[in-house]
Amino acid sequence: EMQRSLVGSEMCIRDRGMCSFQELRIPGVLQRLALCYFFTVIICTNIHEKYIPALITVLLLIYQIILVTGNGFVYGPQNIIAVIDQYILGASHLYNDHGIDPEGILSTIPSISHTLIGYCIGKICIEKENIHSKLEKLFLIGTVLLFAGYLFSYGCPINKKIWSPTYVFMTCGAGILLLSLLIWIIDIRKYQKGFKLFTVYGVNPLFCYTAGELLFIALIHISIGGNTLHTWYYQHVLAHYFGDNCFSSLLMALSIAVVIGIIGYTLYSCLLY
C-alpha cells in the first residue's frame, strides 16, 4: 500500500518534470490521491470498521473548527489554508490562486474523510447480503449526505478549493446516489449495453488520468503554424465550427477524453489492467 502511494506521488512529479524545482508545484491531484490512499490504508487496517464513521465525523468537525477560527472561508492569502501551505512549502511551490492551493496540506484532512466514506461504501457493496438491501442502504446514505451538505451550506459554503465539509457531503452524497442508480440499472434491471465505457476507464483509472495530463502537456508544447497544437485545434476546428464559447471548451475536454478512451479500450481489449 505504501508503495502504491509513493508511485502515485512519483508519477505526478515526473509528469511535471519539465519545470525547474524552484517553480515545481509540490501539491497536486496525484499527490493528494496518494496521501489519502496511504492514510486510509493505515486507518482501515488498525481501526475497526464500526468506528470509522465516528472518525470521519471527528475529522470533518476538527477541520470545520479550523476553518471558522482561521479565516478559512476568506478567498485570499490570509486564509489559514494558504498560511500553512506558504509557511511549509513556500509560495513558489503552490498553485497561485489568491494564495490558496486546492490540494494543499490542511485540506488533506477532509479529503481523507472523503476517502474513508468511499471505503465504507465499498464495504457495503461487497457484503454478501441481498442486493436490494444493499441498494436501500446506499440510497439512504446518499440521500442523508446530500441533504446534510445542502442544509449545512448555510453556515459552511460548498467549496472545492478549501475542500469544505459540505463539499465532502454533497459530492459523496451525489456519487453514492449515482452509484445506486447504476447498480439498479446494470445489476438489478440487467441493462448492460452501452456501459462498457465505464469499465474501460475504471480498470485503468490512474493510467487514463496520467495519460490525459501528458496529452494536455504535449498539446500546449507542440507548435503548429505559430500556435500551440492545443490553440490551433481549438481555433481552427472547434471555435471555427461551433464558436468561441463554453461548448467548444467542453468539446476540447471531450476530445482529450476520447483519445484517452481509445487508448484505454486498447489496453482493456488486451487485458492489460
Residue ranges and their predicted role:
Residues 8-16, 148-152, 202-224, 268:
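Kinked, hydrophobic transmembrane alpha-helices enriched for aromatic residues
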Residues 9, 31-44, 107-127, 145-156, ...:
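Specific transmembrane alpha-helix
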Residues 9-14, 56-63, 137-153:
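Small-polar-interrupted transmembrane alpha-helices in polytopic inner-membrane proteins
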Residues 9-25, 30-33, 37:
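Membrane helical hairpin/interfacial module
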Residues 49-117:
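Long hydrophobic alpha-helical segments that form multi-pass transmembrane helix bundles
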Residues 101-111, 160-176, 199-208, 226-261:
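Membrane-interface transmembrane-helix boundary segments in multi-pass integral membrane proteins
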Residues 135-147, 165, 188-215:
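Functional transmembrane helices that form membrane-embedded active or gating regions
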